[in-house]
Amino acid sequence: MIRFINRIHAGHLRWPYSTFWLGLFILSSMMVACTPKPVWKSYHPVSQDSYPGVHWEKADYPEQLGWSSEKLALARNFSKAIGSDGVMIVDNGIVVDAWGDISRNYQCHSMRKSILSALIGIHVEKGDIDLSATIGELGIDDRYPSLSATEKKATVGDLIMARSGVYHPALGEAASMKGMRPKRHSHAPGTFWYYNNWDFNALGTIFELETGTRIFEEFDRRVADPLQMEDFNVGNCKYLSWSDYRSAPYSIHDYYLFRMSARDLARFGLLFLRQGRWKSQQIISSEWIRESTANHSEWGQDGGYGYMWWTGIHGGLLPNVSLKAHSYLASGYGGHKLIVLPFRNLVIVHRVNTDSVGRRPMSHQIGRLLWLILSAAGEGDIGPDPSIAAAAGKKLDQTDLKRLLKNGSRWMIPNKGIFMGGRHLVISCTTDGTMLFCPYEETEFKGKWWISGDRFYFKILGLRSYFELIRNGNFITLFDATGTMFGEFEAPSI
């Protein structure tokens, strides 16, 4: 019934302008206030793989599935500390635990890319999309300065792997993405990986041209309906053009904005965990699932990238937790994560209310949350406890910090999934209080640093916070305001 009502098109209404916006405000407020409370189906142990029906099946208590309620409480408390708004944990198709607002259709941000990847996979199988076709052959271009003949040699496959070599301004770029965007024409198609919103937006254009469908409606038909998603609503999704952004670059390729609830994203994640099969129906080919979540590019020291899915190598995927291969996730601005762990038959969803101003959990914090969740599952081979409470060594006091930074300091931190960039993140602190953050050799962000008490404060990329530093032997470890490890560097003598 809810999904039927959601299909009513508000565009047919003809209200006076001011009344329309007042009504829209009241309606949206009511929708937030009336977010449906999750309905759970009672858990009944079965030997085969479980799938949700109209509602998810939930264990009466975590110990039914071999989990620790006490350790899950630690995860829940930490998620509140970092600003999480919804968490859902699914073990072999059964909900172990969930908290926060898991039925609200939050923005997906860049998780949209993994969703589009799934739709592309369906239409590659149907023969509608050819990954080897060049964007020139498909008639893809952009506003001035338009694409060169070389750029038009990029294939659809290059775009889906973020290797197009087209560095035209794009919609929806964060400040960090703009700052790290390579110079135009600096890399040939297929030769260099860069997390490129132009590629992702142009793929939306290509998808609709080649399939003759609209992205949101096609997702509703091909995925949401057969998976019996409880909250997904095409009317909540929308396209954003350059006219919707302030000071936006001139690009003809729209940003396709998905909204989805945690419990519906968990169904999408379970579909991938089950190799594209939902009960008796093969919705996405298992070959596409394997290919799209494989490592096609590498970044940092243990990060990989597939077909618009983030992957891990050497135990990586998120900072502060060690994972077995092959694990992968969809990621969106502000801390949105859909994590799929086939080695443990788990799907974990993390949501944040990015419609309002508030804390934005960072990757190293979500990695610690995942560490706590896996600890509650009884996993032992997940790396050391990344909390400051478990750290060995001496905490640097104000005198130590002043000595460390007296003549400036340069910290080279191994980039283990901390920030999209190269193998090391470099933080340089000059004597005048300037802080430089370099995720790549040729990319630099400028901020400020200062010392107050026994804390190293900083303000950069819109973030104001602090680190506490602990020295253990030849290394100094940085811990953030939540007591979570950020990274470590080889310690100079002080």
Annotate each language-model stretch with its function.
Residues 125-162, 211-255:
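Active-site helix/loop module of the DD-peptidase/beta-lactamase fold
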Residues 93, 107-132, 159, 203-207, ...:
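Active-site SXXK
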Residues 114, 202-206, 256-278, 336-353:
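Active-site-proximal alpha-helical segments within enzyme catalytic domains
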Residues 96-100, 165-241, 252-259:
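Catalytic-site signature segments of enzymes, centered on catalytic residues
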Residues 243-246, 250, 294-348:
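Active-site Gly/Thr loop motif
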Residues 2-8, 19, 24-28, 34-102, ...:
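N-terminal leader/targeting segments and the immediately adjacent pre-domain N-terminus
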Residues 387-494:
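Lipid interaction determinants
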Residues 49-60, 70-77, 112, 121-195:
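Active-site-proximal loop and beta-strand segments within enzyme catalytic domains
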